[in-house]
Amino acid sequence: MADIIERIRSQDEYREFYELATKIRNQKLLTDAELHSLNRHQQEVSDNEIKLLTEAWRSSYWNNVGRQLKNQALEPTIACRLLKEISETEALPAYKHVGHHFSTLDQLLTILYNEPQSVAELLNSIDRNDITSNDSTIQVLFHLVYSCALYPEDELKIAQVVCNLLKLQLYRSGSEMRTILRKETSISTRFYKHFVELIHPTMVYLTKALRKGVLDVIQLGSFWLDIDAKQSTARFLRDNKQNEDRLPEYRALVVSKLVDFVDTFLENISKALPMLPPNLNWIIRDIFCSLYEVVDDVSAIELSHACKDMIVSNLICPAIISPQKFGVVDNDVRVGTIVNHNLVQIAMIIQMISLREFESPPEEYKEFLSQCRNTHLISEMMDALLVEKLAPDVEITSLIANGTAESDMATKSSFVGTVADVNVLIKIIRNAPSTSDAKLSRILSVCDKLPATISSTTQKSHFDNLEASPKISTLRNIHRKVQHSFKRTGDSFNDINELGAKQGEALAFGKENFDLFYLEYSPKNYKDVAEADRLKKKAEERRQLADLEKLLEPTPAPKETPVENNLIDFSSGSAETNSEHLSDSTSVSPEPLTSTEELQIGDQGVGGEQRGKLAKLKSLSDRMKKGITQSNTLSDIREHLRRSGSFVKPPPSGIPTSSSEQNLPDVATGPRDDILAKYASISSIKEQKPALGNLIDGTASASSTPRKEPLEPYYSSENLVGCRAFQDTLRKMITVLGNISYLPRIGYRNETKQNEWDKKVLLGRFLDGVLVETEHRREYGLAAQLREVKRCIELFEHAGVEILMDHLKLNEAEQDKIVNGMREERASLMRKSNDISSLEQRVLLNRRLTEQILVDFLMRTFLETGFNNKHTVGKTQEVTAVLKFYDEFKYLRAQDERAEFLKNLLTFLRDRLMQNVDWNFATDTMMSRAMTTIERYVIFAVYDNAFYPNRDADHHRDKLLRGTIAKVSDVVTPVNDFLKIPEHLHGEAPWPSAQAELSMLDIYVTAQDKLNCVVRCCDVINNLVALSSKNAVASADDLTPVLVFVIIKANPRALLSNVQFVETFAGDRIESGRDAYYWVNFKSAVEYIKTIL
């Protein structure tokens, strides 16, 4: 049946038009859809990028708050309010904050971004070795100009600034290079520290290099590792006086453990060298290669050790000491005093290994250095960085940084910062001394265009206006402020008396400090100094040439115009009024005055101008009275007025002299032609200067009129495809057929005449059918377009229509190329959107780490000193409650009583925290984090009693089970029958990621953290099972057997005590939900292991 229908349709003469119109319509729909999707996706990507840059700014400011708290430059009492203000700040377009200065600011930021060498020289000139001022300067540049090194291009620009700045200051220091790096007070070392601590690739490298070693040290537990033998002896004798004979054995154990840890760290650092960020590698290499040839022999040795210090002493050792700060381990892991002490000892030994070639190590280090097996790895690592062949990524970075190759790295689309940041930046630049350097001079000159201090032009919020409104009484304002400030206070108002003092402290962080804006950045807008000077010189030459052409332009000679007998008496009182009426009643504009004429008129003044008008009119009247022939037309009179050098203007009075004059706009309020002329090109000015006489008379001399080339005819049968008629018709048909959503059904066929019809006739009948349908639907606009198409087709002969149809078919391929181009652009936008999402996750991770560090610091302050009774003598209620908990917890024997006691304490501390004035401003995530920190802080001190309620019995039980599991672990495989692991899951065995997660179970101190560890382990297994089976989620039959195998292989140190601890203190968190499901599977696996042993 389908073949019959196709055979019938193939005989239809209109089929070609139907198919062509359908294809054009389909292409139009597809193109419109792609264009709409493209525009929508572009807007989404643009909005998401602004949100990303805003979030990066917030994260940077949170880091700044953390540094100020650590340096005691910021009161902890206002930290929550400040963080809340930062979190709620949204970016607006720059012009809404800085007004008309946004273009100058854009120019300044673009120059700073693209000239890192100039920025380095600028910073070097203002360096005063003051940590506070240097950190403030670096902070502004870091997040305002370089967007927190978010994009690869931003990271490279910061690397160039750091590298050039270090080269300037290290070369100046000579043999004191390492001293500068150790002090960390100069702006170069502060910038380097900022760079390595905050860029994401550095954190990735440190995680790879240090995570395993740090976790090993944490799992060591409460065992002190001391380099100093005297300190180690004192610790041992204090705890084991009766076993003094075993002191040598204890000291040997300490030394062996320290040596093993150091060797492990050095091995992992060396293995992680390929993950070292290319920009950091390039900085070290470029500094060494650039300065090695220009310094003396002593300084060259100093330089090599300085480069080693930049990696070991200034990056690796600080990360070992503070692993949570660099994201090496999670903040969920409690790093106590003993663990921190042990990490410091390890870092000191590694630093001494790197220095031993330059300095003789102290006596207490020699014992460790002689036993370490991997001391050579640091020298080999530095040789790889400084001497050996560059890695491809580092070589590309070097070429781009040195200007040899153009950068193809992704970059940002906007600058994001606050008005306060801009003011700090202006102050920094203006403090720089004057210089002869062209690039620095340009930066200073652009900065001078900005005011010394910029104030935001944004209107105040509705809430602020409401507060200032006199219509609201004072009592109502106070009531609303109290309600707003004490939204979490509840029934306790013990801290109301401090409200005024707290608000006074917070004035330092007013709203104007966080007027956040975004300013569009385009690399195409940047011109280097040489290019800018060239363009400026070229523009000056064009201006001088234009002035010269104006001076050399000939003035047309006046010609006599005969005037007929009918004279107009210009000497009468109505002469001026008549002339004004004549001048206003025509639409022809006078010829613009030359510069000489303008100068003459300007010198005459107002009175002189009026006297000149009257004198010239009187002269013209006298000439007419003496017998000059007069014309009945007005053009001749205007010609006389033009030749006389003045065109009569309306009188200065407010009374109009003609009806048309009432409709003329006021000159003072209208656009100034002389101002607009400044922005017009020379060519447009020339085109707008026709002679006034030519416009009036309609004649012009042959010498003044340019000779025009004859235009090609609109339709040409000889050049059919190239004529304008063909191109216009083709375009119109594509447009009209693309807008038609229906096609006519022509059911009548005249067989007698059908053979005589050609394509032109058939096309006309087809369009007639479309036109009738269009008119019936009252689509008058489309109907008009169809008539126009029919009119255009009538121009062509039958062969021309054939060619036209062929070109319509060829246009289909061109439209396909356009659609493919749109699809490629959409794919590019999708990749960029995915990159933005990845960068957002990175920013949120860094912010979460910063938030955890900040909340931990604030919680320690809250528990140790108390916020609400800061100025009173004695312990706060929080500290008293915690100390009471420590004293009474050890006397409780039943685990249920202990769990209830801990729950009551946490509830009390949460209530006290909610009643605190300052913590009313904390976000929900901060409150949740605060309670987690409080629980860790409290349980850490009583962990041994809570974890081992039966003391030695629990220890013995865990030790016995672990030994038995260890024997099974050596022989167990996934194919053992007692495991009953499905065969299709064997491909992912032995599930090392799950084993690694479960092996950290003992390092957590709270029930929730231990439960999270089990959940992560089960999640890993679930994801791996999903890879090997078609099921998206693993069932219990898949999960439990694999979990049994993982537990046996991981073999936690205190498995049974961990299960007991979570069951006791986790509470309702293991009663329902996803965590409860995983916990039930874990308990089942543990019970099964106990039965098979």
From Swiss-Prot:
Residues marked Arginine finger (site): R182
Localization: Membrane; Cytoplasmic vesicle, Clathrin-coated vesicle
Composition bias type Polar residues, residue spans: 568-577, 584-598
Cited PROSITE patterns: RAS_GTPASE_ACTIV_2, VPS9
InterPro entries in alphabetical order: RasGAP_dom, Rho_GTPase_activation_prot, VPS9, Vps9-like, VPS9_dom_sf
Broad class of the protein's primary localization: membrane
Disulfide bond residue pairs: none
Region named Disordered: 547-610, 643-669
Keyword set, alphabetical order: Cytoplasmic vesicle, Endocytosis, GTPase activation, Guanine-nucleotide releasing factor, Membrane
Assembly and binders: Interacts with GDP-bound rab-5. Interacts with alpha-adaptin.
Protein family according to the UniProt entry: Belongs to the GAPVD1 family.
PANTHER family per the UniProt record, alphabetical: GTPASE-ACTIVATING PROTEIN AND VPS9 DOMAIN-CONTAINING PROTEIN 1, RAB GDP/GTP EXCHANGE FACTOR
Entry protein name: Receptor-mediated endocytosis protein 6
Lineage: Eukaryota, Metazoa, Ecdysozoa, Nematoda, Chromadorea
Gene from which this protein is expressed: rme-6
